[in-house]
From Swiss-Prot:
Keyword Transferase in record: no
GO biological process: gluconeogenesis; glucose 6-phosphate metabolic process; glycolytic process
Cited function: Catalyzes the reversible isomerization of glucose-6-phosphate to fructose-6-phosphate.
Active site per database record: E358, H389, K515
Source species taxonomy: Bacteria, Bacillati, Actinomycetota, Actinomycetes, Mycobacteriales
Annotated GO CC locations: cytosol
Biased composition (Polar residues): 527-540
Biased segments, Basic and acidic residues type: 542-554
Pathway: Carbohydrate biosynthesis; gluconeogenesis; Carbohydrate degradation; glycolysis; D-glyceraldehyde 3-phosphate and glycerone phosphate from D-glucose: step 2/4
GO terms, molecular function: carbohydrate derivative binding; glucose-6-phosphate isomerase activity; monosaccharide binding
Full protein name: Glucose-6-phosphate isomerase
Reaction equations catalysed: alpha-D-glucose 6-phosphate = beta-D-fructose 6-phosphate
Length: 554
C-alpha cells in the first residue's frame, strides 16, 4: 500500500481564511450589482475550450473571488497533483493504484510508461480489437447461431458499466449508421431484463456482459438469465455466438461459455465511473462505429490537454470546480442542477451523479483523518424545458441556493417548425435557455411588478428575487467530440474539488458494506425454516413481514 503523508488541513490555511473573510464582504451582493459595477463581465468572465463556450459571469463571484480561489488551489498543490495523475503516480492511495482514465484517449503515437508498461500501446491494442469486432458486427460478417445478422446489442452491466454507455448511446443516437440498436440492463429487479427482452428475437440479439471481475452479483444474475433466454430458444452452442464480455477474468468468462477471443479487457487504473471511453463503451462503438468512437475519444483529449496545460486562472475545469467549491463551502449550497437544453442529453445528469457523488462523497481524507468541511456536491437535473414545469419554481423562488449548469447547442440535429409554421422549435427551446439564466440571475423586483399594474396583494407572490447563479455552456452541435469534451470537463472538476478537500476521489468503499450485507441477508429471506433474528428490530420486522407475504415461515 502506498504510504500517505499526513495532509495539511486546507480549512486552517491563510488561503481558506482569506476566502471566508471575502465571503463576509461580498456574500450577500446581488448579481445585478456585480453587472452594474463590472459591465464587461458578461464578455470577459468566459472561457473557450475546444468547441465549448463557457460563460461563468452569472456566478456570485468577483475577479477577486476567482483570484482567491486560485490561491486556494495552489495552496492545495492542485498543479502538482494534476501532474502526478497524468504521469501515472498512484494517487488512488487507498487501493494503491494509478488513475489513468486520461490515457484511454491518448493518441496512438503517445507514450506513457506506468509500472514498466507503455499503457498507450495497451489501450490501442484493445481499441483495435474492439474496432475489428464491431466492424464484423456492423457489416453482418458476425452472425448469430442461425446465420441471421445481429440487429440489437444488449449491454448487461451496472454502475459505470451501465450509466456511461446508456447516456452516450442516447446522446449520439443520430450517429447510428449500421442498423444496430442498443439496449441496457442493469437492475437485478427482473422487470428490467424482462421488459428489455420482451420484443427481441434471440436469433438477432447479442449480449455484452460488462464486469471487470465477471463476478458482480447483479450483472452475473442478469447475464445468467439472458443466457437461459438464448439457450432455451437456440440451444447451448448458441452462447458463443450471442455473448461477448468486457472483463479481465478469462477463467470465469470461459466458464460462462464465452469465447475468450471475444473478451475485451481494461485495467485497474480505470474506475468504473471513468470507463465509458474504454472497452465499457463497446456497445456504443457497435452502434456508431469505430471512427465516430475515435472522435468521441478525441473530444476527451482536447479537454485533457487544456486541463493539463492551461494556467489555473484560465483553466475551465479548474475554474468551474473552484466555483462549485465556493458555493459548497462558503455559500451554503448543497446541490447543483444540471440542465441540458437537449433531450438527447436526458441521462447526462444521472451520469454525472455517479461521477461526482461516488468520487467526492467522502467524509475521510486520503490520509485517513476526518474531513473538516463539507465535501461532495449533490448533482441532479432534467432536460429543459421539462424541468421548467417541474422544479424550476424552487430554483426561482425557493429558500435554497441551487447553482445550475445550463448546456445548449446552436445548431440542432433535429428541428421542426413552430405552431404557426414559420419558426424553429429549436429557437424556441434556446430562447427558454437564455431566458432562464437571465431571470435566475436578475429576477424582477416588487417595484417593477407593481409598475405593470399588478394588484398590491399579488405583488409579493410574483417577486423574483434573482441572484440565483448559473453557468452557461454553449456548443455548436452535439457531436461525438463535443460529448467527450463535456464529460472530461466534469471529470476534471471532480478532481479539482477532491484535491482541495484532500480526499481520494477514485475509491468507493461506501458501496461495499451494503453489497456484503445483501449477500448475508439473501439466505435469511429465502430459507424455508424460521429466520434467525436480526441485530436490529426494524430489519427483523421487515424481513419477517416480507417472508410472510412471500408465503414463508416467519
Amino acid at each position: 500500500m502506498t504510504s500517505v503523508h499526513t495532509l495539511p488541513d486546507i480549512t486552517a490555511t491563510p488561503a481558506w481564511d482569506a476566502l471566508r473573510k471575502h465571503h463576509d464582504r461580498i456574500g450577500d451582493t446581488h448579481l445585478r450589482q456585480f453587472f452594474e459595477e463590472d459591465p464587461d463581465r458578461g464578455r470577459e468572465l468566459t472561457v473557450t475550450v475546444g468547441d465549448l463556450y463557457i460563460d461563468y459571469s452569472k456566478h456570485r463571484v468577483t475577479r477577486e473571488t476567482l483570484r482567491l480561489l486560485v490561491d486556494l488551489a495552489r495552496t492545495a498543490k492542485l498543479e502538482e497533483r494534476r501532474d502526478q495523475m497524468f504521469a501515472g503516480v498512484h494517487i488512488n492511495t487507498s487501493e494503491d493504484r494509478a488513475v489513468l482514465h486520461t490515457a484511454l484517449r491518448l493518441p496512438r503515437d503517445a507514450e506513457l510508461i506506468v509500472d514498466g508498461r507503455n499503457v498507450v500501446a495497451d489501450v490501442h491494442e484493445v481499441l483495435d480489437a474492439m474496432g475489428e469486432f464491431t466492424d464484423r458486427l456492423r457489416s453482418g460478417e458476425w452472425t448469430g447461431a442461425t446465420g441471421k445478422r445481429i440487429s440489437t446489442v444488449v449491454n448487461i452491466g451496472i454502475g459505470g458499466s451501465d450509466l456511461g454507455p446508456v447516456m452516450v448511446y442516447q446522446a449520439l443516437r443520430h450517429y447510428a449508421d449500421a442498423g444496430i440498436s442498443a439496449r441496457f440492463v442493469s437492475n437485478v429487479d427482473p422487470a428490467d431484463l424482462i421488459a428489455t427482452l420482451a420484443d427481441l428475437d434471440p436469433a438477432t440479439t447479442l449480449f455484452i456482459v460488462a464486469s471487470k471481475t465477471f463476478s458482480t452479483l447483479e450483472t452475473l444474475t442478469n447475464a445468467t438469465a439472458a443466457r437461459r433466454w438464448i439457450t432455451d430458444a437456440l440451444g447451448d452452442a448458441a452462447v458463443a455466438h450471442h455473448f461477448v464480455a468486457v472483463s479481465t477474468n478469462k477463467r470465469l468468462v470461459d466458464d460462462f461459455g464465452i469465447n475468450t477471443d471475444n473478451m475485451f479487457g481494461f485495467w485497474d487504473w480505470v474506475g468504473g465511473r471513468y470507463s465509458v471511453d474504454s472497452a465499457i463503451g463497446l456497445s456504443v462503438m457497435a452502434v456508431i462505429g469505430r471512427e465516430a468512437f475515435a472522435d468521441f475519444l478525441s473530444g476527451f483529449h482536447i479537454v485533457d490537454r487544456h486541463f493539463q496545460t492551461a494556467p489555473l486562472e484560465s483553466n475551465a475545469p479548474v475554474l468551474l470546480g473552484l466555483i462549485g467549491l465556493w458555493y459548497s463551502n462558503f455559500m451554503g449550497a448543497q446541490s447543483r442542477a444540471v440542465l441540458p437544453y437537449s433531450n438527447d442529453l436526458a441521462r447526462f445528469a444521472a451520469y454525472l451523479q455517479q461521477l461526482t457523488m461516488e468520487s467526492n462523497g467522502k467524509s475521510t481524507r486520503a490520509d485517513g483523518s476526518p474531513v473538516t468541511t463539507d465535501t461532495g456536491e449533490i448533482f441532479w437535473g432534467e432536460p429543459g424545458t421539462n424541468g421548467q414545469h417541474a422544479f424550476y419554481q424552487l430554483l426561482h423562488q425557493g429558500t435554497r441556493l441551487v447553482p445550475a449548469d445550463f448546456i445548449g447547442f446552436s445548431q440542432p440535429i433535429d428541428d421542426l417548425p413552430t405552431a404557426e409554421g414559420s419558426g424553429s422549435m429549436h429557437d424556441l427551446l434556446m430562447s427558454n435557455f437564455f431566458a432562464q439564466t437571465q431571470v435566475l440571475a436578475f429576477g424582477k423586483t416588487a417595484e417593477e411588478i407593481a409598475a405593470e399594474g399588478t394588484p398590491a396583494d399579488i405583488v409579493p407572490h410574483k417577486v423574483m428575487p434573482g441572484n440565483r447563479p448559473s453557468t452557461s455552456i454553449l456548443a455548436n452541435r452535439l457531436t461525438p467530440s463535443v460529448l467527450g469534451q463535456l464529460i472530461a470537463l466534469y471529470e476534471h472538476q471532480v478532481f479539482t474539488e477532491g484535491v482541495i478537500w484532500g480526499i481520494d476521489s477514485f475509491d468507493q468503499w461506501g458501496v461495499e458494506l451494503g453489497k456484503t450485507q445483501a449477500k448475508a441477508l439473501l439466505p435469511v429471506i429465502t430459507a424455508n425454516n424460521s429466520p434467525a433474528p436480526q441485530s436490529d428490530s426494524s430489519t427483523d420486522a421487515l424481513v419477517r413481514r416480507y417472508r410472510s407475504e412471500r408465503g414463508r415461515t416467519s
